[in-house]
């Protein structure tokens, strides 16, 4: 299995949209916009993100197929990372490898991340990449329709 990162292209949008509509993936991602599965809203959101020079949005490619996306972006002048892996690819080390590759592209530290506190898989990915837990917060999770706890992590 060969994992690589590449720039997101127009032709990737259909596959990325379809991966993003999986109900279990939405539940685990938790902190997503309320209109996440609306195709027009998805295309508008992707257009905004792709036009923003502070966002590095990449496709996770596994053996020539789209396995998900990974991005770095800024919130309140802090560098954060996020990723989404197609549920059919969970548990194969793809997110861990993609995150290590993305982190190798920047020397900037600290890097921040957040995950639903019950998303054990995502927390494991972040910790394998060297992130450590630095706090918890509560917030409304659009993917669950309720307020839940999220874990805040940092890589120094």
For each predicted feature, which ranges?
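A short, aromatic/hydrophobic, helix- or strand-capping loop or linear motif
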Residues: 28-33, 55-61
